Regions:
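N-terminal accessory segment detector
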Residues: 1-109, 116-134, 144-168, 173
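Long, well-ordered alpha-helical scaffolding segments within enzyme catalytic domains
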Residues: 135-139
Length: 173
């Protein structure tokens, strides 16, 4: 049973599509900014390993909630890789990062040639952070909310990756 949260959505009633899109871009951008500052300030106040561990905890929980909500809101009934990909296309980070999703008969491959998080760190003179465990938890939580049979395999992820690709993931049933 989902409890509805009271929100005043009346501002959207008079918005045309371009204005709604502009606002959606604003929300997505600030979603990413909050996530980034949260991580940076935890690392600054404590240390990088603590920030990474806390990030892993957050990202092993939030995607499960998102997947369940997306299934409900968008009436996604498919299971397996089809249902996973359909829900994943609505997922906030798919939109923010621009996951390249390759669907094959027995597997799905997600590639990330341009990772906004790692690229921002490099621009600021910071090293890439170890994100494999965090993303494994994220993808497993999301995938298992769609179908617990889905297996997640990291092909590679920062800091160990080829120069033209930050990470690549394989999903199978």
């Amino acid at each position: 049973m989902r409890l509805e949260v009271a929100m005043d959505l009346s501002i959207f009633e008079k918005m045309e599509a371009p204005e709604l899109r502009n606002y959606l871009e604003f929300l997505l951008w600030h979603y990413r900014v909050i996530d980034a500052f949260w991580f940076l300030y935890v690392a600054e106040r404590f240390d990088q390993p603590t920030a990474e561990r806390l990030n892993e905890k957050v990202w092993s929980r939030a995607p499960q909630m998102a997947a369940k909500d997306l299934v409900d809101r968008f009436k996604i009934e498919e299971k397996g890789l089809k249902g996973f990909v359909r829900a994943l296309r609505y997922f906030t980070w798919t939109i923010l990062v621009g996951y390249e999703i390759e669907e094959k008969p027995d597997e799905v491959i997600i590639s990330v040639p341009d990772c906004p998080t790692q690229m921002a760190r490099l621009r600021r003179g910071l090293q890439e952070f170890f994100c494999r465990d965090m993303h494994k938890g994220e993808f497993e939580a999301f995938a298992h909310a769609i179908d617990p049979r889905i297996k997640v395999e990291c092909i590679f992820a920062p800091p160990e990756h080829p120069p033209d690709m930050f990470c690549k993931w394989r999903f199978t049933v």
